[in-house]
Amino acid sequence: LLQAMDAFVFPSKWEGLPVSVVEALSSGLPCYISDTLTHDVDICDAVTRLPIDDPRPWVDSISLPCRVDARRDIEAAGFDIHDSARKLVDLYEKAERLANERKCR
């Protein structure tokens, strides 16, 4: 779905770590996000922060942008889906081992 988009627009007032923004960046989309979001997603030049309380800058900024290839910047910032998946599998395997050890006691 993201590959069919020209840009990712995320005017949110409150978010933790907006993973959807990281996913959009990984797909090469320029991201227009509200200035209220965490700076943890400022991992490449494809992020444009806009004021959440003023629609005019949003309208002015979003105009059929060019897709960007930001994959290296994203991975360098520690957002690698393969690495994250491996860490999650490791965590589940460790939890399973601990649960099995407790059953054997």
Where are these regions (language model features)?
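Aromatic "clamp/platform" in nucleotide-sugar-dependent glycosyltransferases that forms part
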Residues: 13
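Short alpha-helical segment that forms part of, or immediately flanks, the ligand-binding pocket
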Residues: 18-26, 40
